[in-house]
């Protein structure tokens, strides 16, 4: 009988700690959910501004909303959209986001696979002549800030 009483006292102490752990986990879950919702809203918001002809997203929503470029559109924005879709909306990732990547490669590759700035209104490169320094800079930014994080998380590209 004494063993049962001691066991109950010990177990009640352990269960009190478990309740706190579950409360902490529930709070963390709510915060994670809020983060996922905000990231998903970010993707939805940017997709609403995609160029209707190409599906590509603009450099920004003010003075450069008419262009796509490697160092900003591709390097700083698109990877987070792709990762968010991969985590929160697999059909979006496997559909529109991969289509965007294919279109990007098709329309923006200027020197081999190295991309150059694309004009939505011209439906061609922004500059008539390639600028090697700009192309290398944009490509390096895209590789470093965009493609590397995607590859680290997603693995080999399709």
Where are these regions (language model features)?
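Glycan-recognition and catalytic cores of secretory/periplasmic carbohydrate-active enzymes
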Residues: 17-158
């Amino acid at each position: 009988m004494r063993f049962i009483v001691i066991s109950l006292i010990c177990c009640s102490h352990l269960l009190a700690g478990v309740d706190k752990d579950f409360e902490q986990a529930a709070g963390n879950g709510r915060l994670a959910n809020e983060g996922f919702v905000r990231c998903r809203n970010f993707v939805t918001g940017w997709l609403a501004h995609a160029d209707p002809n190409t599906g590509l997203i603009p450099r920004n929503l003010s003075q450069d909303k008419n262009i796509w470029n490697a160092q900003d559109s591709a390097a700083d924005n698109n990877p987070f959209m792709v990762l968010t879709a991969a985590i929160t909306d697999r059909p979006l990732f496997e559909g529109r986001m991969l289509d965007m990547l294919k279109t990007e490669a098709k329309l923006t590759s200027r020197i081999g696979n190295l991309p150059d700035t694309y004009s939505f209104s011209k439906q061609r490169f922004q500059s008539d002549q390639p600028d090697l320094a700009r192309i290398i800079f944009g490509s390096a930014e895209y590789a470093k800030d965009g493609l590397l994080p995607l590859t680290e998380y997603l693995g080999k590209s399709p």
